[in-house]
């Protein structure tokens, strides 16, 4: 059955209250949202051995985006590549300037490949800057003696990320 408008309103208020409580209990990580970078590159697809974003990655994007974009495919691919290059340049500049990096990853293929790809981009720079790796646990205890499993960091609400900071380890 379809919920009534009163039931919908009640559910929305409950969700908002749960969100408020979650933020009140969140462990701050410091920094700003602009300090967080995402490399949306579908790195679990195709060869990831290129340095930076090369022709192989461009071809993967063309194949993947051709499903959605027909008329302006080349424009969409170039726009995506430029955004990724800008992001990578920013991360490298900050890394070279001595800012620590924290890479959040899991066994999700895109996240795991992304972690390896980014480490490969940073390795030749030979900086002494610390890189921390934070792996999402495969299993964890939930409320009321339950076990939960999350597949990727996208399943973790932003207010919960600080709970995992104790899992960070220095990269070799």
Q: Which residue stretches match the model-derived regions?
A:
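Conserved beta-strand -> loop -> alpha-helix junction used to position metal-binding or nucleic-acid-contacting
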Residues: 34-41, 126-145, 150-153
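Long, hydrophobic/aromatic-enriched structural stretches that serve as scaffold segments
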Residues: 67-117
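A short acidic (Asp/Glu
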Residues: 2, 47-49, 111-120, 142-148
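A short alpha->loop->secondary-structure connector
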Residues: 26, 33, 117-131
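Long, low-complexity intrinsically disordered regions
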Residues: 114-116, 120-121, 125, 135-136, ...
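A structured, charge-rich N-terminal accessory region that forms the first stable segment of a protein
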Residues: 1-74
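Short His-Asn-centered micro-motif
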Residues: 1, 39, 104-108, 134-136
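A conserved mid-domain beta-alpha-beta active-site/ligand-binding segment of alpha/beta enzyme cores
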Residues: 148-172
